[in-house]
């Protein structure tokens, strides 16, 4: 898989780390890392790391449909939890980006491009911050899918 080779080779320069889960090429575990410490999110991640004894990263799960790249992957935050309506993260942990919907998806998108764009969207919100009282409680997959479907309906995407 071409995307896997690219991720192994170049991802660290973009603050990304990702691998398939075991032998399953359809589910990837991703880490977004190296957020600037002078940003609200960077400070929150440092505090999260110290409080919960975890890496100061945003853990994502990326699930690929069998007809990828014709259909977009489903991407969700696993942990930490974000404050409501910050960082382009829905209340259920899905990513609020049209490019991850059928109407916004382009088959030429590759994994690295998707993740760089997600990271950029999160960082573009200067108010992106964690819910430090509940940050270590993971988002559930169904919770994320439900939030994603509500978002798609709200914005008229499909």
Predicted regions: what they are:
Residues 63:
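Conserved metal-binding segment of the jelly-roll/cupin
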Residues 1-57, 66-158:
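UBC/E2-like fold recognition across ubiquitin and ubiquitin-like conjugation systems
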């Amino acid at each position: 898989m071409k995307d896997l080779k690219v991720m192994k080779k170049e991802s660290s320069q973009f603050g990304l780390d990702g691998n398939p889960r075991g032998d399953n090429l359809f589910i990837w575990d991703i880490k977004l890392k190296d957020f600037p410490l002078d940003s609200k999110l960077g400070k929150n991640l440092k505090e999260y790391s110290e409080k919960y004894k975890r890496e100061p990263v945003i853990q994502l799960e990326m699930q690929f449909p069998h007809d990828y790249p014709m259909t977009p992957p489903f991407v969700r935050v696993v942990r930490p939890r974000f404050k409501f309506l910050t960082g382009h993260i829905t209340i259920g942990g899905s990513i609020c980006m049209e490019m991850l919907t059928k109407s916004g998806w382009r088959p030429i998108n590759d994994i690295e491009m998707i993740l760089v764009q997600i990271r950029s969207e999160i960082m573009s919100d200067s108010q992106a911050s964690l819910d430090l009282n509940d940050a270590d409680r993971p988002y559930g997959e169904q919770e994320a899918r439900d939030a994603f479907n509500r978002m798609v309906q709200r914005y008229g995407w499909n």
